[in-house]
Amino acid sequence: MFSTTMGFPSTPLEAKQALGISSGISSVSSGLRSGSPMLSASYEPQLSFARCVEQWKGKEIARWIEGLGDQMNPYLGMIRDNIKSGKQLEALDDDSLKKIGISALGARKTIFQAVSLLLYFCHESEHENLQRLAQQVKTSCLYVERTMTSAMRMREKAIRRSEIVNILNSVSNAVLQLAEHTKRFVFWLDRTPFDEEPEFINVRNSVSSFMWNLLRNVNVQPKALFETGSQIVRMSKELAYECQKIVDCDDPLILYACFIESALLRRRSDNINWGLNIQSSYRGVHVISEIKEGSPADACTKIDAGDEILMINGRTVVGWDLTSVVQQVGALDVLELSLIVKRRPREPQLPKQSKLAARALAPSSQTAKTYSTDDYDPFGQSEPLKRHRSCHVISEIIKENERKIRISRRLIRRSSIASACPRKERKNIDERALDGDDEDDWDVHEFIRNVDGEEEALVPRIAKRTRTMRHQPDGYVRSFIDNKLVTDIEDDVVNDQLTFNVKCPNEFAQIKEVDKEELKVLNLPEARVSDEDWKAPYQEFAAPSFRAVGDSNISGFSLDSPRLLPVSSRMTSSVEESAFGVLPSPSTSSMNSVSSPAPFGKFQMSTSQTEWSPNPDDLPGSPISAAYAGMEKLFEGWVRRRKTRAELNANELTNKWPKIWMCLRGHYLLLYTNQNTKRPEMVINLIKATISDSTDLKTSKKNIFRITAAPLDYHFSCFTALDWRNWTQKMKMAKEIFANAGTQPRIMSQSVSSYNNDLSDQNFFLGQQTGSGLSTLPRVTTNGMTTSKSGGLGGGGFKQK
């Protein structure tokens, strides 16, 4: 009764007999273990998964069934007492589960699916290759074609409802079996070494397209199914034709099969993550989708992206859900992790072939043969002698080259095959500095002779180790990679993001609001604003910006209000070049918008053409208190804050990472529910806190920084890496400036912003503070405005009247 759930036959015994579907494949002999590391008929794998399952007892079977879900807990005792050997799983069916006492239909269905998948890995998985899978899909297409044709004939004669139901069930069973075989076939094409070959990529796309169209025509009402019967037959023929291309392909890659291998991961401490990403391709099959570089998983050379996990520390995880597998890996406080994986197909190890034997020697060589079958011409022009190095000199060169190779460092990951091809090496930096006369790392064999085209063809193709799969999943993925950011950015990337390097487009898109009457004509509902981020009043104002003459491309500073951005900076989403700015909203818009509950004031222009500054009294209002009333906002934007333990205990069903509006005002960090709130829900004094960009928090969030204000720790997550860098940089700078100021007034943010034009001059600026005090001191006038005096910073400073 479960033949239509996963594409397997009704019983596991019929599953073994179903292998006769692809008995027409005669190109691969039973003794040729193509997926093994050696092409030998006498090769025996080191680990047999089928033998391991056959030796199971009742306790091992109950432990495996326990991982299928919590709904299996009431039946564990029944399974342990009645199924006492792993061999009994091959004869397990729905009736035997009923006799045991498992009355729930859902529990029997889950157990039967897991057992069928387990037997598949025990028997069929070791013999699979791409040609065999393509033949199975082709055979299933012919079966669908024959079943649909007979169903269309029987529909004309069927009178009773039960007869029509039997016809529909036969068609559904045939299509579902085809879908299951196609799923495995596409899963193979998504992994190396097939994901980089254009021929296999084209076949993969065509097969997926045909299968999706076929399923759309089948998943219809019963009356419409027979109307589209001719289309189903046509698409089945096209799908079979695409699979025939793989069967007739002369590439030896289609004969390579997977094999089972054990891997052991080690780490120095519990704080180090394993560096694995695990995804479920379909229920019960767990695949390593990504391996982080430098992690314990990367150090182990026996696992790659695309390998399927069968056992974790002696426990079989085939058929489990992804959550149980994640708990099995993440909850282990051990320094070693043992995995049994089904490796992806790889290149076999071929015997080394001597290239010197196939190369002809020069006639004048001393090692050449002393006789010749050609006619001797005493007056012919003889070939000049070639001077060779002595054996002593060659041996010295070989020893020197081997010494350099031993001290050199490996450039790429080791290849997945054990072939005769050498891996790339690079010289040590220190050794290169010492040996100035020899800059290239060359091989003595390549110096003596060159490799021709025929010898190039003898070199086997290498399938390099991969850390990521070609098709990343769109759904549920559990990550074991730690949240550490990469701060190294190339100079070219930074220069491309600067506002004055962006070319203005010639054509612009024009956006107009549609009238209500036109919406009625188009029969469209009136739009409603449901996003809380855009309910605040929206107003945009551009102020002129100033950049000192002679500064570099990175040293431009802006005298605009912290809530306002220059026109050029709003053309991109980057605020790196601006000393202070507003982070863009996390919505889909890429414009740097400004939303404030208060209207914008007017700017006052000084008498000098190079001096522009906003009036602090006319700046947009914001919730303030007595402690930071005179401080100007330095930075603000949307972030996510992780709730504290007390907040999570108060309400269990809550969002752990709510989105908040955060504002940096002086050395105070103000947290609001949104930008329209008048009072902050939390205020953090950065002088008494510790700002850290490294955290041991286990979460899938990225771009995390931590603020420790005893006795609490606050974790924040930014939406982009650029926001993370801006927040951490400006908070640390504000903390350093106000901490060194000591007894100076707190209203010095206006003068601080003037010296933030160049981030490279921060060390110089902070050094002047400790030596002779601040170079610029604020002065408060009677009208409340803040002015500053130039302290001799050259072109980087400015005067304000």
From Swiss-Prot:
Gene3D superfamilies: 2.30.42.10, Pleckstrin-homology domain (PH domain)/Phosphotyrosine-binding domain (PTB), Transcription Factor, Ets-1. It is a peripheral membrane protein. GO terms for cellular component: cytoplasm; membrane. It comes from the Eukaryota. InterPro entries: CNKSR, CRIC_domain, PDZ, PDZ_sf, PH-like_dom_sf, PH_domain, SAM, SAM/pointed_sf. SMART domains: PDZ (SM00228), PH (SM00233), SAM (SM00454). It is found in: Cytoplasm; Membrane. Residues 791-801 have a biased composition (Gly residues). CDD domains: PDZ_CNK1_2_3-like. Residues 363-373, 776-790 have a biased composition (Polar residues). Residues 56-121 form the SAM domain. Its main location: cytoplasm. Disruption phenotype: No apparent phenotype. Double mutant cnk-1 and lin-45 and double mutant cnk-1 and ksr-1 show high lethality in the first larval stage, filling with fluid and with a rod-like appearance due to loss of the excretory duct. Double mutant cnk-1 and lin-45 also shows P12 to P11 cell fate transformations. Residues 129-225 form the CRIC domain. Transmembrane segments: none annotated. Keywords: Cytoplasm, Membrane. This is Connector enhancer of kinase suppressor of ras. It comes from Caenorhabditis elegans.
